[in-house]
Amino acid sequence: MVNNAGSDSGVYRDLDAAARAVLERDDDAPLLRLAAQSIYTDDSGPVTDFSAGLYIAVFCNDYPQAFDMAAAPATRRAQYAAAVAALPDDAFAPFTVDEWVTSPIEEFDGCLGWPSPVRSDPPIAGRPPLVPPTLPVLVLSGGLDTLTTWTDGEIVAEQMGPSARWVKVENTAHVTALADPFGCASGLVRRFVARPERLHAVDASCAARIPEVRAVGEFPRRLAAADPASPARGNLAGPTGLRLAAVGAAAVGDAIARWWYLPGSKGTGLRRGRFTVRGDPVVHLRLRGVRFVADATVDGTATWNLDSGKVTARVRVAGPGGAAATLRMAWNDKGRHPSATVTGRAGGRPLAATLPAP
């Protein structure tokens, strides 16, 4: 999953809190769900979408290896073992060297048995600059991309020559211009294709303004363990009501986060319950018995505007011992460090609260 985070910022959203839920409370539901939805591209699917065979062929023929591809397999294995042994202990921290190089998602030793090349055909035969000064090249790098890192992108742009422009797109994972909810990287590509001669004059300041990935703080198992929302002016609800507000907002935010992974229009809550989605670019969600915590249900509707980021919701949260709240909430999903506002009634008392947008 750490590897997959390089192409899926949803892993960054959930992983820390999900790991702590297992380690601190023996609660594996969040981590198991994250693993289930974080299926790497070449784990399954049609070859027309992604060819694992073509990938390994390119990897073994074009990529530099930790051993000599012209050597016999036995010699390669010895060279590879020596290369691994020479790595510093913290090369893949917080993972050990052995944990990382033996991970099934990595291919460090994947070419040990690959046939030796029958002729020399390096993918790049020249020396920098690699393109003529009249040929513009746009290089985009995601700030959270650990597969092709932004430092690699910067090096590529330098090797291309002075006609290249490198742009780091903050808070973005692998392949910046596809599935681009903010329209920044995709807009840069479109403007480049339309007017390549204006590459160095294009305003790319949007790349530094992409909002942060809002990480989940906790995955509480029960309502009593949830951090309460912060009371606002006019609030008369007690701690339980404020916890109901926090859980209600978390359930809506969790359903929105799941939208990116749904193969259709139906999804499931973290600990039971269901929700449905329809519409685009205005997404309408309906939650039925969704349990973000095990002992409280969330029912209601939400609207999420993909273009503006505006989220509004009306939900009823029912907890243990008859505790209940009827709530309205709003936040902007595209804001930087956005806050959610929650109003309504809990236990017969007015509730007004704020909390970090889920």
At which residue positions do the language-model features occur?
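Edge beta-strand at a domain terminus
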Residues: R345-P358
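Post-His helix in hydrolase/transferase enzymes
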Residues: A177-A194
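Histidine-bearing beta->alpha loop at or near hydrolase active sites
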Residues: E170-A177
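Short beta-strand/loop motif that positions the catalytic acidic residue
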Residues: P132-P133, L138-S141, D145
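Acidic/polar loop patches that form or flank catalytic/metal-binding clefts of enzymes
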Residues: R165-K168, E197-A207
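Conserved alpha/beta-hydrolase "acid-adjacent" motif
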Residues: V11, T146-D152
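Alpha/beta-hydrolase fold active-site neighborhood
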Residues: M1-R127, V131, E212-A215, F219-H337
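Active-site-adjacent alpha-helix of alpha/beta-hydrolase-fold enzymes
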Residues: W150-R165, T172
